[in-house]
Amino acid sequence: MISDGDQLQEVLLWHQQRYPRMQIRDLVKLVYQNEFAGGHMIADAESSLQRLRAECQALAGNCSGEKPDEVFADIGNGLCRLQLAAIESTGIHLTTVNQFFVNTARSRRGDLTSLEQKLDVLRACCQAGSLPHAPADLDAFLLAYRAQGYPAISHSAVYRDHYNPAYRVVDSVYRDHFALFCRIDALLESQDTVCIAIDSPSGSGKSALSALLGQVYDCNL
């Protein structure tokens, strides 16, 4: 079985290869999200939804930056970045995406000790030459970052300008059942009520899937 450190290393290397203009700040942000997901509690789901709608509206009128060709980008620890620029053709409702995000933020905690251990994995990758960043530059960044109390941070200007990142960090279980959520939302376009039957052998996850649907939709189980 792959260790947590090895999994994180794979994630870091994949992202650096996929986004070669990643800076140290962007890698640290990736490690932070691997530990804390969105990094904050969502007290008001409606305000979160309004921000999501505004961001997607801005994306629709923005032709700059590289466009993602995948809906989800794995960030390890059972989490993904759901990339907003890639969802228009899927038919998924923004209310559904927002609920993915809210549920994930409310269920993930993380801790600073674990974050520091994961930053050590990042440091080891730089020391080994697996990532194109000088260990001394990383250490200087982390020294200042630690002094600030390890807050959630934004992407670097280089990353923002080239990749125009717009995403929500969500639990990977939503990726695993994304086709089902898209199908449900498509049905809700034409009818007020959707009945879903989950037919599978005992112990195959019917109860877990039912609970997941109940967390996303206002429904009876």
Model-derived features: where do they sit?
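Conserved lysine of the Walker
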Residues: 206
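Long, basic/Gly/Ser/Thr-rich N-terminal segments
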Residues: 1-159
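Pre-Walker A (Motif I) flank of P-loop NTPase domains
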Residues: 191-196
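Charged/polar, solvent-exposed surface patches and flexible loops
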Residues: 99, 182-186, 215
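N-terminal pre-Walker A segment at the start of P-loop NTPase domains
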Residues: 162-189
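Post-Walker A helix-loop "phosphate-sensing" segment adjacent to the P-loop in P-loop NTPases
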Residues: 214-221
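P-loop (Walker A) phosphate-binding loop of NTP-binding proteins
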Residues: 201
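Hydrophobic positions on the alpha1 helix immediately C-terminal to the Walker A/P-loop
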Residues: 209, 213
